[in-house]
C-alpha cells in the first residue's frame, strides 16, 4: 500500500516515514503544498497524511483542489492546530480524518488502517477513470456534480471500457461481451449504444471520452 506524507518539517516527515515503512507501507514525502498537490493528483496513493501549515500552498488549499479534481483519495490532516474551526473547515472541504500533533503512533496507525479499509470497501464496487466512476452495484455513471443511470447494455458496454481503459477494443469483442454470439445487425446497435454513452459522458462533463479507431474498434481515453 502506497502512502504520501506532506509535511514541511523534515524530521517529522522522516519519522512518520520510518514508522510506516516498518509496518510494510511504501511511503513518499513532499515538503510543500505545491509538490504535495502534484503528487496527489497522480492518483497513485492509497492515503495521504497532509499538514495544514505548508509552504507555497496550505493543506486546506491542497485538499480543495484535490476534491475539485474528483479524486477521493483518503486524506488525514496531521497538524499542530487544534482549534475547532480548523478541524471543521478541513472536514467540510472533504478531509476523512484529523489528528493533532503530538500524536500516539498506535493511534495514527489505527486511523490509517480504518480509512484505507473503508476506501477499499468503496472501491470494490466502483471502476474509475479520470473524473468518472462506474458504480457496479447501482449501474450509475457518476461525476462529482451528477450521476446518470445506465441501461443494462449501456452498463455492460461501459464496464468493458472501464476494465480495459486506454486499450483499443475490437468491435466484435465488444459485441460478444454485451450481446453474445452475434450477426452483422448488432454492429449498428453497438454504434447506437456508443452514441448513448458519449452523450451521457458529455452531460457529466467527463474528462474521458470514447475514441473510434476506424475499421477496428473503440477505446476509452482521458482527454489530453
Swiss-Prot record:
Record's comment on post-translational modification: Phosphorylated by DltS.
Compartments where located: Cytoplasm
Domain of life: Bacteria
Sequence positions bearing 4-aspartylphosphate: 51
SMART domains assigned to the protein according to its UniProt record, in alphabetical order: REC, Trans_reg_C
Cellular component per GO, a single term: protein-DNA complex
Keywords, in A-Z order: Cytoplasm, DNA-binding, Phosphoprotein, Transcription, Transcription regulation, Two-component regulatory system
Cytoplasm is among the record's keywords: yes
Positions of the Response regulatory domain: 2-116
Protein name: Transcriptional regulatory protein DltR
Organism for this UniProt entry: Streptococcus agalactiae serotype V (strain ATCC BAA-611 / 2603 V/R)
Gene coding for it: dltR
